[in-house]
């Protein structure tokens, strides 16, 4: 990935995507605000599931819009259907609910045309990719992560 493309990608990931995501989430709830109370108890129920149970309910679907990160309540309102960004957001929320932390890591191919979001637990011992929870070697987690995807990605943001 060229320096310019890498800089543009980092700008998108760190600044533009969160702004765009806020707009998309607000627009989504603008016409559904009256249903918000319905999803709060479901969110609470999901917090009692194991991570494997929760992620097994997740269904991957390609984005219709430019890439965006849904809020957890938005993912729940959409019946746990989203793309890899939604899965990473959901896993990060689950870790926080269970006194741990996770971070969203974005993987890109060398040419920048192929990208994927995952959530890596704070101790680097596991990551979540769509509906899978995968064990990592914490001492060499970056290389292990790349190998889990057959080395089709080479850039971590």
PLM feature segments, named:
Residues 1-157:
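A structural boundary/capping signal
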């Amino acid at each position: 990935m060229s320096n310019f493309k890498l800089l543009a990608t980092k700008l998108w990931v760190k600044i533009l995507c969160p702004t765009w995501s806020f707009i998309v989430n607000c627009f989504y709830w603008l016409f559904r605000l009256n249903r918000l109370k319905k999803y709060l108890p479901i969110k609470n129920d999901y917090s009692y599931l194991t991570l494997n149970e929760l992620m097994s309910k997740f269904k991957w679907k390609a984005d219709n819009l430019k890439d965006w990160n849904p809020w957890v309540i938005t993912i729940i309102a959409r019946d746990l259907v989203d793309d890899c960004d939604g899965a990473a957001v959901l896993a990060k929320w689950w870790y926080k609910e269970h006194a741990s932390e996770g971070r969203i890591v974005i993987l890109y191919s060398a040419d920048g045309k192929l990208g994927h979001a995952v959530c890596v637990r704070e101790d680097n011992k596991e990551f979540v990719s769509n509906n899978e929870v995968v064990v990592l070697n914490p001492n060499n987690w970056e290389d292990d992560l790349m190998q889990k995807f057959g080395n089709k990605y080479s850039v971590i943001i």
